């Protein structure tokens, strides 16, 4: 069976994906583990566009076709802002990865707005081979708070409120957050589709 190569060096992401896909008896490795150091520019207009670009770029770089390549792109989509921050989630305030500035800009943009519905979206693309690509999208719905709450997580987590749990992502225990997250939703879908693919072989 092939090995799944993850198009990321984010250790939290790597561990979460390994935990879920291990049920299929697949070996999962990160870029670091196979000695690849590459950044693919995320310049597509959709989460799926970025995920697909990353997965295909890496797949085409690798000579050893024993690898399937899994890539994802995710972010926050706010209804009243027309889907923003969207694909610009990580650089909403201009500087890439400045969560504090991004959260401040989001709060400023939503000042006085009553409709605070939003969702985290995770698009995943798994390139099995050039003729077989699995694409899925996971989501988790919530609302945008009026101030940051909680010390866990990262990014927009302190502002993302989930009414079922009456707390933000940043206030949740990591295991709870991971069990309901947009990434978990996408991974579960990938797992089911991959399971069907393996069974058909």
Curated annotation (Swiss-Prot):
Can you tell which superkingdom this protein's organism belongs to?
Bacteria
Q: Which cysteines are joined by disulfide bonds?
A: none
Q: Which GO terms describe its cellular component?
A: cytosol
Q: How is the cofactor bound?
A: Binds 1 Mg(2+) ion per subunit.
GO molecular function, one example?
Answer: XTP diphosphatase activity
Per UniProt, the keywords (alphabetical) are: Hydrolase, Magnesium, Metal-binding, Nucleotide metabolism, Nucleotide-binding
For activity, the cofactor(s) needed are: Mg(2+)
The processes (GO biological process) annotated in the record are:
nucleotide metabolic process; purine nucleoside triphosphate catabolic process
Enumerate the active-site residues.
Answer: 73
For the ligand (Mg(2+)), the binding residues are 41, 73
Give the residues the record marks as binding substrate. 8-13, 74, 154-157, 177, 182-183
Recorded catalytic activity of this chain's protein: XTP + H2O = XMP + diphosphate + H(+); dITP + H2O = dIMP + diphosphate + H(+); ITP + H2O = IMP + diphosphate + H(+)
**Might you give the EC number(s) for this enzyme?**
3.6.1.66
Question: What quaternary arrangement does the UniProt entry report?
Answer: Homodimer.
Which family does this protein fall into? Belongs to the HAM1 NTPase family.
Q: Could you tell me which HAMAP family the record lists for this protein?
A: Non_canon_purine_NTPase
Described by its record, this protein's role is as follows: Pyrophosphatase that catalyzes the hydrolysis of nucleoside triphosphates to their monophosphate derivatives, with a high preference for the non-canonical purine nucleotides XTP (xanthosine triphosphate), dITP (deoxyinosine triphosphate) and ITP. Seems to function as a house-cleaning enzyme that removes non-canonical purine nucleotides from the nucleotide pool, thus preventing their incorporation into DNA/RNA and avoiding chromosomal lesions.
Q: What is this protein called?
A: dITP/XTP pyrophosphatase
Protein's organism? Clostridium tetani (strain Massachusetts / E88)
């Amino acid at each position: 069976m092939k090995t799944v190569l993850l198009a990321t060096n984010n250790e939290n992401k790597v561990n979460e994906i390994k935990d879920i896909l291990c049920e299929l008896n697949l070996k999962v490795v990160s870029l670091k583990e196979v000695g690849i150091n590459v950044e693919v520019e995320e310049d597509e207009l959709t989460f799926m566009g970025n995920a697909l670009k990353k997965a295909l770029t890496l797949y085409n770089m690798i000579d050893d076709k024993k690898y399937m390549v899994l890539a994802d792109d995710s972010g926050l989509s706010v209804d009243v802002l027309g889907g923003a921050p969207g694909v610009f989630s990580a650089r909403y305030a201009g500087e890439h990865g400045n969560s504090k500035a991004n959260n401040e800009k989001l709060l400023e943009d939503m000042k006085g707005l009553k409709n605070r519905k939003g969702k985290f979206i995770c698009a995943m693309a798994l390139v099995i081979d050039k003729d077989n690509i699995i694409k899925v999208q996971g989501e988790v719905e919530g609302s945008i708070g009026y101030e940051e709450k909680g010390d866990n997580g990262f990014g927009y987590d302190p502002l993302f409120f989930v009414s079922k749990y009456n707390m933000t992502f940043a206030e949740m225990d990591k295991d709870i957050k991971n069990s309901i997250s947009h990434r978990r939703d996408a991974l579960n879908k990938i797992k089911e589709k991959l399971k069907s693919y393996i069974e058909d072989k």
